[in-house]
Amino acid sequence: MFANFRVYVARRRAFYGDYFAEYDTNADYHYDATGLGRIHKKGIPSVLCLTSPITAHSNYKLDIENSTDFSICAGIKTENGFEYAHDGKTKYTLTSKGVTEHCSYAVFECTREDGSSYTETLTLSDEGAKLTVKGKGKFAITFPAFLYDGKTETSVTQTENSLSVTYNGYTCTYITDGKITDRNIIAANRNGHYKLYIAEGEKEITLEIKMYFPEYHTK
């Protein structure tokens, strides 16, 4: 079993089995956004979950104008609503990383400009990716539902605590111990259009990301 965690300047890359994830902790907002911007599974189309963060200040042209930056990341509730780490106002500090027999993991201390902080833990295993956020207050994890690659539309199904996206037979499923809410935002990168959602919770929130091949659903 191949498991690893590597650091490349402001980018942190995690590997375990067929899963790969990449954080950008100091993004260039002409191209990227701070947070978890890439998560793939070997053999599955990279666009299905997220293959590139979304920026509202891109140096390249898109067919729609983005109203927000975006990565998979935490948001903390304030009097103005949720404030997300993808806005560039959160400092990510890697405090712990490692590999066990069953997973690789990384723990970040996330500090906002007002001094508030929380921990964000990414775990990769054969089962998929898991993001856990802990701290004082109310938190959300924002995540994307891939909609359209310019030719093919996806199918999206949602319950209170799960959401699945199916694209050419491949499926990405998000599962949370909180409640899923639509942010009513559609954003784009060079791979296509995404609809943005959040999973909400108190003091702690977990989001699991699992990707499946077409044959998984036909057995």
Regions from the language model: what does each represent?
Residues 1-180, 184:
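Extended polysaccharide-engagement surfaces of secreted carbohydrate-active enzymes
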Residues 166-219:
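Beta-strand-rich recognition/accessory modules
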